[in-house]
C-alpha cells in the first residue's frame, strides 16, 4: 500500500542479486540466499535460521540507508513470508538506528507462509517506538532519519529452525 503523492526513492526487487542486503543477528552477519524465481514477483532473498542466536534481520545496504532522510513522512513497504504458520517470537519488525537514537515498529500480525505485504508510514502516529519505550514523536523520527546508520527488517518469527524470505522493498518520499 502506498499513500498518494509519494515519489519512489528506491525499489529493491531482487531480480538478479541480493542487491547488497545482509542477514544480521543470528550468530553473525551473512549474505542471504538469492533466488531468481518464486518471489513477489520474480526473485527474492532468504535465510535459514541457525537456531543458535538471537532474532535475525535482513540488514539494508548503504543505498537504502542513505535514502532514509528523504523518506520522512513517506513509506517503507516490502513483502515477507516464513516457513511455518505458528505462534512465534514477539520482537520488533523494523529497526532504524542512528546517533540520535533507535526507532522500532511492530506490525499487528506476522507474515504467513505465502507472500505477505507490509507497509508503514515513516511518521509519528504510525506506531513507531523511540529507544524501545515511548511512542516516537515526529522530531525524534526526523532526528534518526536525518543521519541513519542502519535499517533492519525482521526475518525470523519462530523459535527454533525456520526460514524467512524478503522481496519487493520500496522506499517512498513523503508528499
Language-model features, listed with the residues they occupy:
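Extracellular beta-strand-rich recognition modules
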Residues: 76-80, 149-155
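Extracellular/lumenal carbohydrate-interaction signature centered on repeated Trp-anchored short motifs
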Residues: 54-77, 85-88, 109-112, 141-147
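Extracellular carbohydrate recognition
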Residues: 143-145, 156-173
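Extracellular glycan-recognition surfaces and repeat-rich motifs
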Residues: 13-50
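Extracellular carbohydrate recognition and processing domains
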Residues: 100-142
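Beta-strand acidic-aromatic groove motif in beta-rich domains, primarily in extracellular
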Residues: 83-98
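Bacterial Sec-dependent N-terminal signal peptides
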Residues: 1-7
Amino acid at each position: 500500500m502506498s499513500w498518494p503523492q509519494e515519489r519512489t526513492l528506491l525499489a529493491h526487487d531482487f531480480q538478479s542479486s541480493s542487491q547488497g542486503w545482509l542477514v544480521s543477528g543470528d550468530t553473525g552477519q551473512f549474505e542471504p540466499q538469492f533466488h531468481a524465481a518464486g518471489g513477489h514477483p520474480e526473485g527474492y532473498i532468504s535465510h535459514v535460521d541457525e537456531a543458535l542466536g538471537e532474532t535475525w534481520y535482513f540488514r539494508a545496504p548503504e543505498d537504502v540507508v542513505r535514502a532514509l532522510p528523504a523518506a520522512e513522512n513517506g513509506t517503507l513497504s516490502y513483502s515477507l513470508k516464513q516457513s511455518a504458520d505458528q505462534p512465534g517470537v514477539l520482537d520488533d519488525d523494523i529497526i532504524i538506528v542512528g546517533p540520535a537514537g533507535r526507532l522500532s515498529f511492530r506490525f499487528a500480525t506476522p507474515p504467513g507462509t505465502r507472500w505477505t505485504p507490509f507497509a508503514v508510514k515513516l511518521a509519528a502516529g504510525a506506531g513507531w517506538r523511540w529507544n524501545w519505550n515511548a511512542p516516537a514523536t515526529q522530531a525524534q523520527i526526523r532526528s534518526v532519519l536525518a543521519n541513519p546508520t542502519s535499517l533492519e527488517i525482521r526475518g525470523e518469527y519462530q523459535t527454533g529452525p525456520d526460514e524467512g524470505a524478503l522481496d519487493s522493498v520500496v522506499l517512498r518520499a513523503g508528499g
